[in-house]
C-alpha cells in the first residue's frame, strides 16, 4: 500500500514540475495528501497556494482548516474556517465544520445553532449538516427535536457510526436507556478500531453494564 502511495505521489509531483507549478495540479497534490491523511504535507502545500494564488481562497482555507482539525490543532483550524467565511459568508460546509467544532467544545452554542440552521437551509440534503443541527438541539437540551432530526439522519445513512452514537446519547438523555444502549452497540460495531469514538462508546457501554 505504501508503494502505491509513493507511485501516485511521484506521478503527481512530476506533473506539477512539468507544468510550472500549475495551480490546479499543485492543488491535486495537496488534496491527495489530505485524502491520504498526510496532513502536514497537505498543510504545507495549501499554505503555498494561499500565499501565491488568489484563486478559490475561501475553499483553500477551508481545506487547510480540515487538515488542521484532523491534526488536533483546533486553534489553527478555527482561524482558517473563520477566514474562509470572511471571503464566502454562506458556504454551508464551512459553517457546518466550524459550528460543529464549537459545539463539540461546548462553546458558542447559540451562535453555532444559528450557523447550522443557515447551513441546513442552504443544503438540506447533507446528512452531515443535519447531524450537526440535531446535535446543536441536543446541546440546547431540546431532546425531542434532536431525536427527530437524528432519526432522519439514520434514515438517510443507516451505517454512520457517529450519528448512531449521537442518537444513543440523545435517547439516554431522554431516559430511553435500552434504546440508547442498542444504538451505542450498533455504532461500536460499525466504527473503525482507530476511530476516536470507539473508545468513548466502550466506556459508555461498560459504565451501564451493557457491553
Predicted regions, residues:
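Structural marker of alpha-solenoid helical repeat scaffolds
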Residues: 18-19, 52-53, 87, 122, ...
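TPR alpha-solenoid repeat register
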Residues: 25, 59-60, 94, 129, ...
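Terminal, low-structured helical/coil segments at or just beyond the last alpha-helical repeat
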Residues: 166, 173, 177-211
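Register position in tetratricopeptide repeats
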Residues: 1-2, 35-36, 70, 104-105, ...
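Residue-level recognition of tetratricopeptide repeat
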Residues: 31, 66, 100-101, 135, ...
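Canonical tetratricopeptide repeat
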Residues: 28, 62-63, 97-98, 132, ...
Amino acid at each position: 500500500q505504501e508503494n502505491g502511495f509513493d507511485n501516485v505521489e511521484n506521478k503527481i509531483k512530476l506533473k506539477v514540475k512539468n507544468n510550472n507549478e500549475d495551480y490546479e495540479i499543485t492543488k491535486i497534490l495537496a488534496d491527495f495528501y489530505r485524502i491520504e491523511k498526510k496532513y502536514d504535507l497537505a498543510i504545507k502545500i495549501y499554505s503555498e497556494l494561499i500565499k501565491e494564488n488568489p484563486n478559490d481562497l475561501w475553499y483553500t482555507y477551508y481545506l487547510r482548516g480540515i487538515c488542521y482539525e484532523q491534526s488536533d490543532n483546533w486553534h489553527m483550524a478555527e482561524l482558517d474556517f473563520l477566514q474562509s467565511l470572511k471571503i464566502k459568508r454562506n458556504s454551508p460546509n464551512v459553517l457546518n465544520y466550524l459550528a460543529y467544532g464549537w459545539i463539540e467544545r461546548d462553546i458558542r452554542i447559540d451562535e453555532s445553532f444559528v450557523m447550522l440552521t443557515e447551513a441546513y437551509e442552504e443544503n438540506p440534503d447533507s446528512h452531515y449538516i443535519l447531524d450537526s443541527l440535531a446535535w446543536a438541539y441536543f446541546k440546547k437540551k431540546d431532546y425531542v427535536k434532536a431525536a427527530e432530526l437524528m432519526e432522519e439522519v439514520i434514515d438517510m445513512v443507516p451505517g454512520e457510526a457517529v450519528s448512531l452514537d449521537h442518537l444513543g446519547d440523545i435517547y439516554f438523555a431522554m431516559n430511553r436507556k435500552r434504546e440508547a444502549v442498542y444504538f451505542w452497540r450498533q455504532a461500536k460495531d460499525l466504527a473503525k478500531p482507530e476511530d476516536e469514538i470507539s473508545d468513548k462508546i466502550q466506556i459508555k457501554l461498560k459504565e451501564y453494564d451493557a457491553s
